């Protein structure tokens, strides 16, 4: 025993001595071209809820390659209907629809089927013929008449290896054993042939297993090869902690199985990828991008939480979060040449500890773009064989980063860490990246030397502090979250439910000045019913000075958001404390970042004439350009001079313009008219109400009645940008872990023309947000009417407009 203990101590000492000597490093070979970069990893399962939720601008910027969406009029979820959002899928190679989504509850008629099994009355073949195939017929006939049918993939069974429909029932449990497998195979053949009899060219995807398991895949492929029912698209899911390290093994094994049974290589779509704790965290998701680019697989992010934010890739309907920036930079690399990347890393199986990257060479061979993650210390990037590109010996290096700031924390721009000019020696360049955060991704660019580039070596970079490392007070405790968090094990602080419960944390700033303290928090529903969702009132104490802050409801504790406090702090050590006041909440981490006034806003060049501008708030911005003429902003048409002001909505604005331009914050305005709820004429069921926080709003407009009308006088004909301040907290359906939020819509009518405008759920009747839409108005008076058309209804339920507090009518420029 003594020898064993001594041996273990020696191992521990050796293990602990490794990190000190280890230098994380990544090598990019600019001469080793692997193929063309795609956006096949940019796919989503129920990521789009309704038309413009999320917005076309924020989705178009990502160049989505595939989606999995609900079958038309399906009952599985109240949103995600493929017909409602198909206009935002122009970039998609594949549009997958789950036919079983016609049924409500998870897993599709689970309780009904299990009750019949207990009674001994369930016959899977009878259920298939009498309940499922009539629905399949109805849906296929409808879908085959749609303009997107050539890209459509019918997923006829989803995760049927759970054995609910076809499994063998033994002693109260269902089993996907040999009997279950044969039942599924027969059902597959019946359904496959049935669809082909109606639509011979239909693409059918399957088997749709919940994971990749060699035996299950082999059996399925053997059966389909021998029975003339091989799917056109191979589908499985990757939802486990081993998905990333085993991704290539699964791919290679599947290709081996195809060859074994003489099947031509099929396109592969992993229609659900990512664990709950990974989705939304860019540091984790980059590993999936790398895996899919190497294997050529399409993938759709799993739906673990909400259906209205691209599976945690947007902060709301139109604002980026940190994960959006990862997928946007990935989209910018589409069409470029992928470069070989080799990593010197310590940990193969823990993604956050695995330094890795994705690199491309621009189409004109003069810029190397890299996205890297996996280190909480500075690391080296060795770019080799630049002499094989069109870069010369003088280059500009730019290093940016986005930190994970909560699932719904808005991140308006990456943080610029360094920018400098460098010399390439013998075709090689070494770059040191000041990595400090495992939950960040780093964007590194090597481009031709820019003589006008501002030299930046930021030493006062953002730093993260984990609340679980603070001093817990009262009954506060740490715990592991099922969702994305920062830090290591037990990365959340909860239990702050009564007076005295809280946490105290020390933090340090290197230099005196203004700082943003970004608090990543979660706020669940204390009441247990949707209408009980409310703010948490929290006592926050910074260096002994107390104030009460309000943390908005995030539906679930671990659906984290961001609350930002700006403080003037002297250099040195500081303390921040949080204590319960009213309502429960949880804390993840705090990112301390030097404040920089956002004078110029980011403008991303997408093509010759298309740009994406990221505005921090709704309002007017100064446009500076060497060009003047016609402009389109999110489809609203107008014209501008080379020095002008334009109205932008908060978040992403898709702009078409004939020249390059810059945008700056400005206080000036063009035409802008605000209409308050109390100034609007109501009729029918519509009501004017005031909530406990003093907000006056219009409510109870539905497809069963209620109308709001107001007049606005505008100076000229044209497209106007209408920004509405609203709240929406509706919910429908039931699911074990997804919150089935409903996106309310209002029908806006002017000049005899109507449009249905969807508004994203704000997760509380007391949380008001803005959304902006376009309205064509005529010079002079315009009567605008707000109703609800009833054009979109879930399960024939009454459809409502959102709570409306105010609207502003804004000229484009």
Language model feature labels by segment:
Residues 2-10:
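Sec-dependent signal peptide recognition
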Residues 17-153, 186-206, 264, 319-494, ...:
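Non-catalytic accessory regions flanking glycosidase/transglycosidase catalytic cores in CAZymes
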Residues 46, 69, 156-157, 206-207, ...:
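Conserved beta-strand positions
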Residues 49, 72, 159, 212, ...:
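Flexible loop residues that form catalytic
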Residues 107-256, 277-288, 312-313:
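Active-site cleft segment of glycoside hydrolase catalytic domains centered on the general acid/base Glu
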Residues 239-334:
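Catalytic-core region of carbohydrate-active enzymes that cleave or remodel glycosidic bonds
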Residues 450-813:
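Extracytoplasmic
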